[in-house]
């Protein structure tokens, strides 16, 4: 089946479902994005050897978003095509159309909700979780996310993911590059007057190998820390402090131990900047 027709059919079918029922309590939004850019690369990611030459490339990202919302249910589908100019011929049958986001959320109460599906995540200064919008593909996660958010500024998020490389019948090697086998995280946030405090714990597990004796053995990496921000509209100074500690094991089961301390200070010369 043509992948483009398949995804288009999904969007059209869901749109028909969303439009059923009382219109006054529902909202459907359809929008898109066409983003192109050119890059001149001379030592990008790593120093360029003397025997190699610089490169100039152009890239294109196209997205189609369908968002539905009512008092109890929210949903979003984002189709994405990411390509480099000249990567495929105009008659090529290969395509790069994919599913960037596809999730549904149910509001149990105004404060408590559950979201299931592929979704982009962004927290704090985007150091650990980011949609990576600069990337031509972006980042998203397949997971279940529980949210509890109060009107007083207190927030708690619990996310959990378990990945497989296909529709497997038994535990198999997970060979998706740069991706975890499982992940659980907890994010807490609270506004305290002019201060905003957050805490984050992330536990992700990676298969130690592809053989039968290793696929059931996971190496777990833990990252725990938090952020403290200060901002007062009556003064021109603000800061954002970050602290993280990482421990556990990497995918090759090597021991991990690392620290991060960061402080960002900002002083506004005028209110217009």
State each model region's role:
Residues 10, 23-121, 143-151, 156, ...:
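Beta-barrel outer-membrane channel/assembly domains of diderm bacteria
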Residues 139-148, 177-185:
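Membrane-interface loop-to-helix entry segments
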